[in-house]
Amino acid sequence: MRRRFQQVDVFSPEPFLGNPLAVVVDGEGLSTEQMQQFSRWTNLSETTFLLPPTTPEADYRVRIFTLARELPFAGHPTLGSCHAWLAAGGVPRDAGRIVQECGAGLVPIRRGERGFAFAAPPLIRTGPVDGVMVDQLASVLGIGRGEIVDAQWADNGPGWVAVLLKDADAVLAVEPDFSRWSGGGSLDIGLVGAYPPGAECAWEVRAVFSDDQGAMREDPVTGSLNASLAQWLLASGRATAPYLASQGTRLGRRGRPWIEQDADGTVWVGGPAITCIQGDVEL
């Protein structure tokens, strides 16, 4: 069956410098197995499938797949899917606010002149990382244990463990080696380090993780990680909102996710989204 398809670049103001997302606009009728197979074939970090909502509060529903599994929530797929839904003719109930239904529940999305922003979902795992885990993280990252300023669980779905290093240069210098990981299962690490005051961006972020084959991969720009990092950094007093982050530098990308915080404490993660490829796919 022929289905509408878009490939959207997310989180960069310039095409081809953000994080690409494959979006099957007409996802209804596909099985989970078909969705997973197509997601593996695209070889992108995530692929999404748009579906009719199951609740009247939502404008649309999305299912999000990595190469290996389905996720309840992910950030750049949220913004890219919202962009694709609107570009395909979707009309929200509220012109300035779109509500996405996904595995994590309902996610409100703002639309503004700079792009889209989603409300950071609650963390499902928080708290400090134990000493044994810190040792393992240092080994995987190829750095001394003393170079880790702090490490915290910051999981909003994918399983992120956040690692704070002394500065942005330290983050960019890391050469991860997941063959040193002895903890079993997958490992999703978010690295963050500050730029000097007055720089274009406040923080450098990297997302490194093991894929379904145990190989190391790096995500160009990661909304879910930037969301959980912002929640941690703001709550701990290490950051103040609004701020601009940088991600994808080591991959030759120019990701620029922005962070805002409402008076009630809600954290928003935003960025541009640009359709780079559109057409049909046989599924």
Predicted region positions:
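Short, surface-exposed beta-edge/turn micro-motifs
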Residues: 19-20, 158-160, 188-189
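Conserved phosphate-donor
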Residues: 44-61, 178-216, 244-267
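Acidic/His- and Gly-rich active-site-bordering loop/insert found
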Residues: 21, 28-35, 40-60, 64-67, ...
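Acidic, low-complexity central loop/insert segments
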Residues: 37, 58, 65-183, 234-283
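Generic N-terminal amphipathic, Lys/Arg-enriched alpha-helix
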Residues: 16-24
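Glycine/serine-rich anion-binding loops at beta->alpha junctions
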Residues: 15, 62-85, 214-229
